[in-house]
Every structure is written in C-alpha cells, then in structure tokens.
C-alpha cells in the first residue's frame, strides 16, 4: 500500500520527479475551493495534467455539516465498523470512454491526541505513530467515465478497525485521533501497470468529513444525531408517537399482555404426559357429571382417584388394567392408540401404561373375570417358587395374556403362538425326585444337595409357565377347574405313578454314605 501511495504522489509522500508541479497545482485548487463555498461545489487537493476538468461533489453535505459543527465521531471496532454518514460523491468531467479507478484512504488530520471533557474536545498529547496507510479500492474499479458519472459513488462498504493485525483489509485507525478521508481518481493506463509513477490521478478532500475515531461515542449530541438520521438505528430511538401508539395497542384487549411466568406454566403443563389428568380432576367442577364408557357403565371423577395404598390386597379390584382382549393380532403399528386427552376419550380407551394407577370402573362380568384371572395368575407366579400352592387356581381357559412378564406396554400380547401346550402331570411328593433312577447317578457322583436340585426344577417350571401364557387359549387347553396349580411344579421326566417306597426317607436308598465321603 505504501508503494501505491508513492506511485500516486500522495501529499504526505515525498516524490522527487514532480515536486514543483504538485506544489503549484494545490495553489490553484485552493483558489478554486476559496472561490466556491456553496454546498454543491467540489474541493480538489491535487490534480495532474489531463485531470483538470474532473469535479467531485459531496453527497448529503448538509448532514455532514451538522456533524462537523458538533464534532464528528466514528466508531472503530476490532471486527470493523462502517461509517455514518456514508461517504458518497457525485463525479463529473470524466472522459466517457476512458477507464478510471476510484480509491479512498483516511489519513491523520494532525499529530495530536484528543480527549472529550466538559462537553468539548481538547488536545491531550502527541499522536501515536500512524499505521501504514491502507487504500480502499471501489469494487467497480476499473470502469469507464460513463459508469462513474451516471450514479453516486459510494464507499459504504468501507470499514474502520482498531485491530493492527486486521487481515480483512479494513482501514486501521487509532482511537482518540483525528482523521481526514480522501478520494483519489486514477486514470487506468493499459500500457503502464497499476501503480506506475506516470499514471495520472487527482485527489479530492472535503474538510467537513474529518472525524475523531473512538471506541464509543463521547458526545451525546453525536449519539442523538446518528439515532435520528441513521435508518439502521431505529432500535435506539425513544418512545415517539408511533412507538406509544404501538404500545397502547399491545396493552389493549386485542393484544393482552401476559406475564412470562404464566406462559412458562402453560408450556410446561402442556408437555407433561401426566398433567392433563391432574388438571382435569382438580381444575374444573364440571367433572362431577358422569361420562359414558365403552361398556355402557358410567364413571365419575371419584372413580379416577388413585388408590390410597401402594400395594393393595388381593383380589385386587384396584390393580392395573390391561385391555389385551380388545387388541387384534393383525393390528398394524400405525393403528395403535396413543395418549389422548381425558376429556376426548373414555377411560377404557386410554393407554394402560399411563392409567395404571387408577382403579377400573365397574364394568361387565367379562372384564371382571379377566381382571380376576390376571390377579390369580400373578399370585401363582409370585409364590410358586417359595412354597407349595394351597389355594385353587382357575382353569386354563381363564388364563389370558395379562401377566407381568409377557405383556409389553405398547404392543399386542401374542406370545409363542406356534408352541406346543405343556403336558400336565399329577401330584407327586417332594421326595419322589430323590428316589427316581434318573437322578441317582447325578446325586451320588457330583454330590449335589437337595436345594440345588429343587432350584433347577423350579427354573424349569417357570419357563414352561411362560410358554403356556397365550392371549387366546387353544382348544386343547380346555380342562376342568379342578386342575391344581401344583401340577406345574415338575418336569416331564418325573414318573406319573406313585409307588409306596417313594414315600420313605432318602437314607433308605443308600445315599447318605456318598454325601459323607464327598463332604
């Protein structure tokens, strides 16, 4: 950039080839500036031969004068900030067919450092060393004289920065220093390269565009002027008539002002999966009216209250409800019923995953029968491995898919439709397993104890119990209600006939000596 300035013969750059010409031409330019002080008059600083007829007029000069009277300030940031007012000029006197390059630079206006105190600018010391000058080349360069003269030439994209290591080509300035923008019109020469010393150029300076760079506005009058005239500063303007009118409309009945806390409560309650039951039960008095269910039995809001005990006693009329009988095997996943508001559907249509804490309303005998079957079967599943069952269990025709281990919360209840039913065995005494011939070699050779053998058999029994739980009972499973739950306690290999010697104690077969040796 410094080489470019030397080539153009900038005033602060020593040029040995044409020093006298540059000194003579400013006098003529100063006479032009003194003779014409109208707002539309151009002010030229330096002009070379062949560029005499070019005139430049500052756009929005009145606005620049308003800022200049107060003391123009320009904000500089690390990322770069654009100027306001924008530097726009009108150029005339160019050769229509000749190509020109328009450049702009900002140079120090003096060698002082300033400070703002007592509502005025004053000199506080010597200026810091100036950074190497940077040139802003207009994006349309090079262009013909016709292109430059038919519209305003704007330097709106020029940015000011205080970052001395700026890599984006912004103009680097020091804070609290005074600067003067300059416009350069360079005649593009195809024979000579860009930046040749023989290239003709002219420089134009407008004193009302001088400003002081600052990181924040010091004079409140400058702040007010920029807010009033900058179209991008509408957010900083005060409550004028339009703003007051807009606020009055917002606070009217058409646009009620809702507190943010109320909005947050509504948003959080709508996203909660359990919020609708609580809000509908306690929030409105209209829930005392009865709503008809699918089975024709009415239920009130009192029926929907959760039970007082977390572990109710059997027969469990307030236990979780699983409507497996209403699901079809051919039902597609897209047809599954999802969570719906309570006011839109009846309780029997709700997903049991969310309704598990509520009691079942009084329904027909078919639903009660299925409910009791689920409770009895769960009791048998929970207590089968701890003690022999002493209470009768319903028949196999009542056994449905309502169990804790085989029913997923959102899918149908078909489990192992192609599996064979379990073979039912009569009751046998517990000691019969230790006298059978199939178990004698294992007990004598490996020295396994009775608890371990019984534990393995109970595991085998639990697997068969899971297989037999199907959603729709097979015809081959129809039996009388006299079938006891103890028939499921033993595997297939146990003989069905009971001989009298099987009721004797274990030591009569000769197993005690083997245990003593291995122990």
UniProtKB/Swiss-Prot annotation:
Judging by the UniProt lineage, the source's domain of life is Eukaryota
Which Gene Ontology CC terms are recorded?
Answer: cytoplasm; nucleus; protein-containing complex; protein-DNA complex
- UniProt KW Transcription regulation keyword: yes
Compositional bias of type Polar residues: which residue ranges?
29-43, 262-303
Stored InterPro entries: p53-like_TF_DNA-bd_sf (IPR008967), T-box_DNA-bd (IPR046360), T-box_sf (IPR036960), TF_T-box (IPR001699), TF_T-box_CS (IPR018186)
Q: Where in the cell is it found?
A: Nucleus; Cytoplasm
Task: Report the record's Gene Ontology biological process terms.
Answer: animal organ development; cell-cell signaling; embryonic forelimb morphogenesis; embryonic limb morphogenesis; heart development; negative regulation of cardiac muscle cell proliferation; negative regulation of cell migration; negative regulation of cell population proliferation
**Which pairs are disulfide-linked?**
none
Span list, region Disordered: 1-43, 254-312, 335-376
Question: Per the annotation, which location comes first and is thus the protein's main one?
Answer: nucleus
Q: Where is the composition biased (Basic and acidic residues)?
A: 17-28
| MF (Gene Ontology) | DNA binding; DNA-binding transcription factor activity; DNA-binding transcription factor activity, RNA polymerase II-specific; RNA polymerase II cis-regulatory region sequence-specific DNA binding; sequence-specific DNA binding
Could you tell me the keywords of this UniProt record?
Answer: Cytoplasm, DNA-binding, Nucleus, Transcription, Transcription regulation
- SMART domains, alphabetized: TBOX
* UniProt entry tagged with the keyword Metal-binding: no
Q: DNA-binding region located at which positions?
A: 63-238
Q: Name one Pfam family in it.
A: T-box
Can you quote the domain comment? The T-Box domain binds to double-stranded DNA.
What does the record note on quaternary structure?
Monomer. Homodimer (via the T-box); binds DNA as homodimer.
Protein role: DNA-binding protein that regulates the transcription of several genes and is involved in heart development and limb pattern formation. May bind to the core DNA motif of promoters.
Q: What is this protein called?
A: T-box transcription factor TBX5
Organism equals: Xenopus tropicalis
Q: Upper taxonomic classification of the species?
A: Eukaryota, Metazoa, Chordata, Craniata, Vertebrata
Gene coding for it: tbx5
């Amino acid at each position: 950039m410094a080489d470019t300035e030397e080539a153009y013969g900038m005033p602060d750059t020593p040029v040995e080839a044409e020093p006298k010409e540059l000194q003579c031409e400013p006098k003529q330019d100063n006479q032009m500036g003194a003779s014409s002080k109208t707002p539309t008059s151009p002010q030229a600083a330096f002009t070379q031969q062949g560029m005499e007829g070019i005139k430049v007029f500052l756009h929005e000069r009145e606005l620049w004068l308003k800022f200049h009277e107060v003391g123009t300030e320009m904000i500089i940031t690390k990322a770069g900030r654009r100027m306001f007012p924008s530097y726009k000029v009108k150029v005339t006197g160019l050769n229509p067919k000749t190509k020109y390059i328009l450049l702009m630079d900002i140079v120090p206006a003096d060698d002082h450092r300033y400070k703002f105190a007592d509502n005025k600018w004053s000199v506080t010391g010597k200026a810091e060393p100036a950074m190497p000058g940077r040139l802003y080349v207009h994006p349309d360069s090079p262009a013909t004289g016709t292109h430059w003269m038919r519209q305003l030439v704007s330097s709106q994209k020029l940015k000011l920065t205080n970052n001395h290591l700026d890599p984006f080509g912004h103009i680097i300035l020091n804070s609290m220093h005074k600067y003067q923008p300059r416009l350069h019109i360079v005649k593009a020469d195809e024979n000579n390269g860009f930046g040749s010393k023989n290239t003709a150029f002219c420089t134009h300076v407008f004193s009302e565009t001088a400003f002081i760079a600052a990181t924040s506005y010091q004079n409140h009058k400058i702040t007010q002027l920029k807010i009033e005239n900058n179209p991008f500063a509408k957010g900083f303007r005060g409550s004028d008539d339009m703003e007051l009118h807009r606020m009055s409309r917002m606070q009217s009945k058409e646009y009620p002002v809702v507190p943010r806390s109320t909005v947050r409560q509504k948003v959080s309650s709508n996203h909660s999966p359990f919020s609708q039951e609580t809000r509908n039960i306690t929030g409105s008095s209209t829930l005392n009216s009865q709503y008809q269910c699918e089975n024709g039995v009415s239920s009130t809001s009192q029926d929907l209250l959760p039970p007082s005990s977390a572990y109710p006693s059997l027969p469990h009329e307030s236990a979780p409800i699983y409507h497996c009988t209403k699901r079809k095997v051919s039902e597609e996943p897209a047809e599954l019923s999802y969570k719906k508001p309570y006011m839109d559907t009846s309780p029997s249509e709700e997903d049991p995953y969310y309704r598990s804490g509520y009691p079942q309303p009084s329904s027909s005998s078919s639903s009660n029968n299925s409910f009791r079957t689920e409770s009895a079967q769960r009791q048998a599943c929970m207590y089968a491995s701890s003690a022999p069952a002493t209470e009768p269990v319903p028949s196999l025709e009542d056994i449905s898919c309502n169990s804790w281990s085989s029913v997923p919360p959102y899918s149908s209840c078909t489990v192992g439709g192609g599996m064979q039913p379990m073979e039912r065995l009569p009751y046998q005494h517990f000691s019969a397993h230790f006298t059978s011939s199939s178990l004698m070699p294992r007990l004598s050779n490996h020295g396994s104890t009775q608890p371990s053998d019984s534990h393995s058999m109970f595991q085998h029994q639990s697997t068969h119990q899971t297989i037999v739980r199907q959603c729709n009972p097979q015809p081959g499973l129809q039996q009388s209600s006299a079938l006891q739950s103890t028939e499921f306690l033993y595997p297939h290999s146990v003989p069905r006939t009971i001989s009298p010697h099987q009721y004797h104690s274990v030591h009569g077969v000769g197993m005690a000596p083997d245990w003593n040796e291995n122990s």
